[in-house]
């Protein structure tokens, strides 16, 4: 049976620019911290896997470390809890619509009997909120979510994808990961899985040499045609991706050349 594993942030919705970044900055303000990340600075922080880890990186600045005292683990945990609540409110307020093609592809995949899952090292409650907003509560209830600190290491470590495959009993040869970043791609490839990448503003210039297909978005009927940035598989995309394109991404190739088998 074919399986699709979706990353959350930047894949289900454009959460980084319009959700996580403002939530981080609102948290910093709420706790009286002077830090405010610009879009460019946050783009650099995205190279660090995990929200708590990004917050912890503030202490790499000696001036910040001198000003902010206390147990760093406790501080970061408190900040991150607040940031997660702010982020979830942004989702509830409708600030983060799904990326094109997400509701359509997920709905059609479930109708065809494919397994659909979400694997992310973001906070589980945030991931579930984004998923429910993207596809609706009824559809989201049919989709297993593996997220948060369920694994000890963040992407690019492959642990989250290996766990998802093991828990669901998936065949790697029949499983396609949909990611948006190089860290996510490396995590998928490290787990021996083929990966389709839908880029976003933060990741469009990253190296996706291991991806079987790289596109601007999944696309939808009535929208401008998608841009195919790289195609190392058997898919022959039209103006938007369909399930047959995703299935074709699993045909032939190896992990090293963008395949996955």
Residue ranges and their predicted role:
Residues 114-115, 120:
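A structural preference for short, pocket-lining loop segments at secondary-structure junctions
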